[in-house]
């Protein structure tokens, strides 16, 4: 598939997601980085978003809870180029009932080439990268070209 470029602006649209056993870790991380996150547009799956907004005072656009379709909503936003990066603290030792949705979300994030952090260390690296505060060009699938090929 051909690619084209997309600009992630200096004001990022960031998805915050955590499995139940990781919500406290994501809350602690978010509190630690509250000032760095303030200028950005924050999205989260339902329960996580409500906890983060209540405990940090940050403005968070909460979607549905992950098992109720929130993971799929985030995937749709990524495919529509409305999410620039994702912080997803997940529990690798526990199977989630909505594991297929989680796998699909990670696949879409990979297809659309957005930066993804899956634990505190990788989230710290993303947030402290010099690229975080800049406009950044990334390669993404050329969907228009893909569609033309399929319809030819």
Curated annotation (Swiss-Prot):
Pfam families: MGS. Keywords: Lyase. InterPro entries: Methylgl_synth, Methylglyoxal_synth_AS, MGS-like_dom, MGS-like_dom_sf. GO terms for molecular function: methylglyoxal synthase activity. SMART domains: MGS (SM00851). Transmembrane segments: none annotated. Signal peptide: none annotated. Residues 6-152 form the MGS-like domain. It catalyses: dihydroxyacetone phosphate = methylglyoxal + phosphate. Its EC number is 4.2.3.3. The active site is at 71 (proton donor/acceptor). Disulfide bonds: none annotated. One of its GO terms (biological process) is methylglyoxal biosynthetic process. It is an enzyme of class 4 (lyase). Substrate binds at residues 19, 23, 45-48, 65-66, 98. One of its GO terms (cellular component) is cytosol. HAMAP family: Methylglyoxal_synth. Belongs to the methylglyoxal synthase family. Catalyzes the formation of methylglyoxal from dihydroxyacetone phosphate. This is Methylglyoxal synthase. It comes from Haemophilus influenzae (strain ATCC 51907 / DSM 11121 / KW20 / Rd). The lineage of its organism: Bacteria, Pseudomonadati, Pseudomonadota, Gammaproteobacteria, Pasteurellales. The gene is mgsA.
């Amino acid at each position: 598939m051909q690619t084209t470029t997309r600009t992630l602006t200096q004001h990022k649209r960031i998805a915050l997601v955590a499995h139940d056993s990781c919500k406290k870790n994501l809350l602690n991380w978010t509190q630690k980085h509250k000032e760095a996150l303030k200028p950005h547009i924050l999205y989260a799956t339902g329960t996580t978003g409500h906890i983060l907004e209540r405990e940090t005072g940050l403005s968070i656009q909460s979607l549905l809870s992950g098992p109720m379709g929130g993971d799929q909503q985030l995937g749709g936003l990524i495919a529509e180029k409305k999410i620039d990066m994702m912080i997803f603290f997940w529990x690798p030792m526990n199977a989630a009932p909505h594991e297929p949705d989680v796998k699909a979300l990670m696949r879409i994030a990979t297809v659309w080439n957005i930066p993804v952090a899956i634990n505190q260390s990788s989230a710290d690296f993303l947030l402290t990268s010099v690229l975080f505060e800049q406009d950044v060009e990334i390669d993404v699938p050329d969907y228009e070209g893909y569609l033309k090929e399929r319809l030819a």
